[in-house]
Amino acid sequence: LTIIRRNTKRMANRKQKEEVTLYFAYGSNMNHEHMKMRCPKSTYLRKMTLPDYELVFRSVADIQKAPGKKVEGALFEITKDCERALDRYEGFPHLYIKQYVDNVMFYTMVDKDNVYPPGEGYLRTIMTGYNNCDISTESLIDAVNESLTALDKSII
């Protein structure tokens, strides 16, 4: 897990006010404007890489274990209120469940059976998030192409 050093003094001051959780976003929540609407008290810290996972689409973004691969995303500090709002947005615990790596929380889909491409508007939201975080869209485009290939194979 690659995390650049964080400003521990700022986090310590914030923790005195409210307990926070480190949250890794890899889909639509990377979009800073959308994240602020869902979680006004969230703080974007930096881009982050989650090793041994890959981005896939099941209509919406998901990640799955994939040794040797990586997922780039956004690291946020979120409050308990933010986490509850994200739980509702992500359909926790029915659509997504929470997982943790090195005390960083992220959501993964419960149903891992089908790969299916995202809608155009949803994809634009994610692309904006990639731009917000200064992350190359190469892996995003690869994941979309994989989902389109899977769809083509299911039609044939």
Task: Give the ranges of each region predicted by the language model.
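Short, Lys/Arg-enriched N-terminal segments with co-localized hydrophobic residues
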Residues: 1-10
